[in-house]
Amino acid sequence: MRNRLLSLVTLFLSLSVATAVSASPPPKAGLPLQQELASGSALVTDQNTGKVLYSRNPDLVVPIASITKLMTAMVVLDSKLPLDEVLPIAISETSEMRGVFSRVRVGSQISRRDMLLLALMSSENRAAASLAQNYPGGKNAFVKAMNAKAHALGMKNTRYVEPTGLSLHNVSTARDLTRLLVASRQYPLLSQWSTTPEKTVAFRHPNYTLGFRNTNHLINNKTWNIQLTKTGFTNEAGHCLVMRTTINRSPVNLVVLDAFGKYTHFADATRLRRWLETGQVTAIPAAAKAYRLQRDRERGLGQPVAQAVR
């Protein structure tokens, strides 16, 4: 009888627990799934509040390729050197330029303004190298100014060794580059030059003209409102993209680094915009995912989890 009573009590308690569990509130409905990216690191923040909207490995130190040129242009503007001064295309002080193809002829001349335009709009390496070589004190003084500016902006994990981004030793993080994007708001010419769709530039000595286009094809997409942009690529850095743009009617800073494929960084930006505006998750191609996982393993990252605040 006693054993039977104990069994009934146990059964009653089990049913009570089960009922309590089943009656507990379900997970909140409507929470969006997390968007996966093909890029190794990324960060999206609200320009007005600084709130993080999406992040993936934001403090991972990686090569940044031609994203470097944003700092190059900023240092030139800080110098207050005359923008209409005509300068020679000179690259001898930047050893990374050896063997790098360019349509721009060494020794020909354009204005400092046009050099800045070409460096930002079409990522012209000879223009960026020439800006440094025509700086007071030359390339070495210029690189010193780049690193001093990074330090002043609180870019603690950033280092520059040359002005083009060709060196794998030009490194930064998504978080540091977000600080650079924030600072760029004080330089309206950076926005103007970096978002110019295309331009024909006239060179002197000898006289010739060349047409250039923006390296970010999203500039021509009317569904995007881009205030500033810069792309970058080297084998070591992968495909990189930074933008000041508008998502969900709010101004944001967007950084994606080390993406696989010629258009993957643009696709990741589009995935992020769609997800932030609608909650819709978009799959990434298998090849792009395999590349990202391989890069993660090479860096000992395992399976980092993206985080977001929505």
From Swiss-Prot:
Catalytic site: S66, K69, S123
Protein name as annotated: D-alanyl-D-alanine endopeptidase
Described function: Cell wall formation.
One GO MF term attached to the UniProt entry: serine-type D-Ala-D-Ala carboxypeptidase activity
Enzyme class: hydrolase
Top-level taxon of the source organism: Bacteria
Protein keywords: Cell shape, Cell wall biogenesis/degradation, Hydrolase, Peptidoglycan synthesis, Periplasm, Signal
NCBIfam families found in the cross-reference section: PRK11669.1
GO biological process assignments: cell wall organization; peptidoglycan biosynthetic process; proteolysis; regulation of cell shape
EC number: 3.4.21.-
Signal sequence residues: 1-23
Listed InterPro entries: Beta-lactam/transpept-like, Peptidase_S11, Peptidase_S11_N
GO cellular component: periplasmic space
Annotated localization: Periplasm
Matches recorded under PANTHER family: D-ALANYL-D-ALANINE CARBOXYPEPTIDASE, D-ALANYL-D-ALANINE ENDOPEPTIDASE
Binding-site positions, substrate: K230
Gene: pbpG
Family the UniProt entry places it in: Belongs to the peptidase S11 family.
Organism the protein comes from: Pseudomonas aeruginosa (strain ATCC 15692 / DSM 22644 / CIP 104116 / JCM 14847 / LMG 12228 / 1C / PRS 101 / PAO1)
